């Protein structure tokens, strides 16, 4: 652990993340072959003939793979690098586009052989996966998904209108998701679920119910992302909303130095889904989770609240009073505890709130005794005149964790 500039203890990602990526790079460099795919040829055929450590270069063009009824591309070979050779400045003609065909559900799925997306346990683990330069379009489930992968890199891809999740690292470890664009999902543009030691850097995420979502994960850093025009910009959600099993430790989600703005999209999620219950206008929504950091972000123009820290049962009962902690017990502690909210720059938030929501820069709501709300620290957010509403007895934002 280390201390932040404010003295708050902050756990850092394990150094094995960087070491793992270095080992991955060295492994792929030794005795590796290069495969090239041109328009009219099959990317999947090259994947199927590749050996661990090989690199596949794909020329610009539009590709529809017909060999797999479930996935556009299925990767189960260790340390494979799949690279789209984008020609900048040529628009659609310069992209490597992967389009949905037939009954395919997910665009790119990387996981060990025999371990499908319906499984929560796999006897094996895929070692190393790298994808760059793909535009994945119009799949009914996910754009690019990893599952049971150790050491993965998802870099400079575009996920367009993949209807559940755009980029979806699940049950995976030691990963980098960097400089991607993801939009048009009906769930989440980028969802880190059940994963550990993941860096999310420099992505643009927009046009979805949630821009960046983190659930049941451990050690996630999100920095220098541009998150805008979603229903909720950043969603840090309780295990009840996860759809994946809980990890032994689910802490240290660090949301720092991002631009989070204008997240006021009318919610496009299908009725009955968890996402359909999200109200528009929230920059960061921390919902019944603990031991996380939201700091040094520029948060502006979110109609309901710039940052909301809310207990799980409080949030669910706002929409349905019968869904309180007594009648609808949560899977885990519903409190938001031990969170650090510091040095965020807040402007023009809460100016056009959803009916029933008090429009403010910072909203803090928890309902004792089920939601104790201990150890939280709101410190040095600016300007000093930012607006807030707090359920604390003294009406102030909590500082007992500072």
Question: Where are each of the predicted segments found?
Answer:
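N-terminal secretory signal peptides that target proteins for export/translocation
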Residues: 1-12
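Bacterial N-terminal signal peptides
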Residues: 14-26
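Acidic Gly/Asp/Thr-rich repetitive segments characteristic of extracellular carbohydrate-active
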Residues: 33-59, 64
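Right-handed parallel beta-helix/beta-spiral solenoid domain characteristic of secreted/periplasmic
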Residues: 36-39, 60-70, 77-140
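Short, T/G/N/S-enriched strand-turn elements that build extracellular solenoid repeat scaffolds
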Residues: 43-50, 64-75, 121, 148, ...
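Short glycine/acidic-rich loop motifs that flank beta-strands on beta-rich extracellular proteins
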Residues: 47, 67-71, 91-93, 101-106, ...
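Right-handed parallel beta-helix
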Residues: 59-60, 79-86, 124-138, 150-164, ...
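Acidic, glycine- and Ser/Thr-rich low-complexity intrinsically disordered tracts
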Residues: 315-319, 326, 331-334, 345-402
